[in-house]
Every structure is written in C-alpha cells, then in structure tokens.
Amino acid sequence: MIAIWLVVLGITFVLCMKRTIYGCCMLVYARILIPDIVRLTPLADISLNTGIIGIIGIFLFRDLLFQKVTLNGLVNDKYIRNILFFAILLLLSILLGTCLNFSNQIGYLKQYFITDLFPPIAVVASIRNNEDARLLLKSVLIAVLINTVYGIFTVIIGTNPYLFFLNLYYASDFSKLIDDSLSSRSGIIGTSSTFRHANFWGTFLPLAFVLVFYYYRLTKKKLFLWTTIFTSICIFICTKRT
C-alpha cells in the first residue's frame, strides 16, 4: 500500500517542480478523494496529506528564493491577511482552554496550522494569473464530481468498498477511528463517500454546493449543472451535518 502513496508523492513532487500550483491541484484531489486515515507508515508517521503539504511547502520556499513569490505580496494579500488574523485568534484561544493542558493545545494548533491554514496560503501564493485560478477550480470541480458520484454509488450498492478496505488496512493504527462505511439515520441510509466519517463529508458538501452552484450560475455549463445536482443529492444521503 505504501508504494501507491509514494507514487502519489512522486507525482506531486514532479508537478511542483514544473509549477507549484500543479502540486496544489494534487492536494485538492488528495484532500477530497483520499481519507485522512491514510498514513505514510512505516516510512514516516504522518498522513499522506501532510506529506503532500510538505512537498508544496518546499517548492513554495523555492518560489520565495527565486522571487516568483514575494513576502510583501503575501502579506498584502487580503485573503492571506484574513487567514493570519484567524490564526492569531486561534493562538489567543489557548488562554480560554479548560480541558486540555497548554502543551496539548499547542500540539493540536501546530497540526491545524500545517494541515488547514498553510494550504490556502500556499494556494493563494501559487496563483499568478487567471489560468491558474481556472485550473484550480477545474481540479475542485472534478474532485467533487468524483466524490459525489461515488457517494451515490455506495448507497445504491449498499456498501462503501473503498473506505472499508482502507479502514481494514489501517485498523491497527486507527482502530478507534473506524466507523461503519454506511450508516442509518431516521430510517435513511447514509454514506461518507471518500471521507473517513459522514460528519466530515456533511461539513464539506454544503461548501462544495455553494461553489459549484455559483459557477453554474456564472457559466451555465452542463458540467457544473450535473455537479450541482449530484452534490444536492449527496447532501440528503449524507445524513450528517448537512
């Protein structure tokens, strides 16, 4: 199994060598289509997503060295300023913690900064023109389309073979995280598609719906229309957080 993920990392590395934005597109596919239970053990005790983010970070540093990206440009970007402001609020929230000790909170925040705050900063820094933005949007669209079609497919066949296999493979490392591939709520069969848990998928789907529906209204393209329809269906069959 590790060989497959090494191939994914290798592809990401090659894409980043060409342009960092290509690696960011690879991260989009990985975040949406590969559950976060996938680890790089025994090579390293980190998730596949963290490995991809690390590669992107290396090449973003390269872009800074060769002035393809400037610190002034990053700091002056309104979107990145908002992210940094949010990061400062998270740091201040440590003072309000009641359940965890200080060292644990720092560890959780460090992981959150790496996996959730750094990627959007890297994406914004890597987009240099409209073509880059369209490429990233197309990657999101394709990933959402695959994710929603597969989610509908799992409900039709009554099982989630992809997630079941990954849960079975990583059970020794994440036995507490294993959940049924399909669940039932109020008599409705629900699924989590390519996400580890339906809660995560349920959080993702409304955001995906807003994005694809907005661009359908903007472009009137049939691909956006079908993705909007599939996303709408999945919001109902997820049964969690939607």
PLM-predicted stretches and their roles:
Residues 30, 62, 97, 123-128, ...:
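Membrane-water interface at transmembrane helix exits
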Residues 1-92, 104, 131, 138, ...:
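Transmembrane signal-anchor hairpin modules in multi-pass inner-membrane enzymes, especially those
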Residues 40-41, 98-107, 236-237:
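Membrane-interface helix caps and helix-loop-helix hairpins in membrane proteins
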Residues 8-13, 88-95, 118, 137-167, ...:
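Alpha-helical transmembrane segments of multi-pass inner-membrane proteins
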